[in-house]
Amino acid sequence: MSKKKREKGAGSTPATVQLEQAGVEFKTYEYEHSNDHMDDGYGIEAAKKLGFDEHQVFKTLMADTGSERVVGVVPVSGHMDLTALAAAVGAKKAAMADPKVAMRESGYVVGGISPLGQRTKHKTVLDESALQFDEILLSGGKRGFSVGLNPYDLLKVLDGITAPIGTW
C-alpha cells in the first residue's frame, strides 16, 4: 500500500498528522456525508459510499472503566462488548463514555472520532478481527473522511492491543 498524496483541498487532521509523523503508509478516502443515512450509522454510511465490506470498516468508541477512559475500535457491522473491553485492559467493568466527554477528550465530533490524533491519549483496543485484513478503514477525524491502513501499523502507532471485543 502506498501513501496517497493529499489532493488540493483535502486538508489534514490530527489523525493524518500522527500517521505522517510516524512514517506509516496510509490512504485517504473522502465521501459526501449525508444525514439521510443516519438510520444505519456513520460507519455503515462510510462502508456503503466507499464500496468496502462492513467488516473491514471500523468505528471508534470510548468507554469509561471508572478509573480511566479507553478506546475500542470495532467493525461498523457490530457492537462493542464492554465486558470484553474491560477485561482486555484489566478493569472490572466498562460503560460507554458520555458523547460530550468523548468529543472533548478526542477533539473530534461524534461520527468523526478517530483513535488517531486524539487530544488525550487513551489505551486503545482493536478488535482482533481487524488482523485478517491488509487494510482497514477508520475515521480520519471528520465525517466523510476515512483513512485506510494496515491494522498492525495502527497498533504500532497507538501502542494498542488486540482482543475479541466485537460482537455481532
Short names for language-model regions:
Residues 1-168:
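Extended, low-hydrophobicity, polar/charged segments
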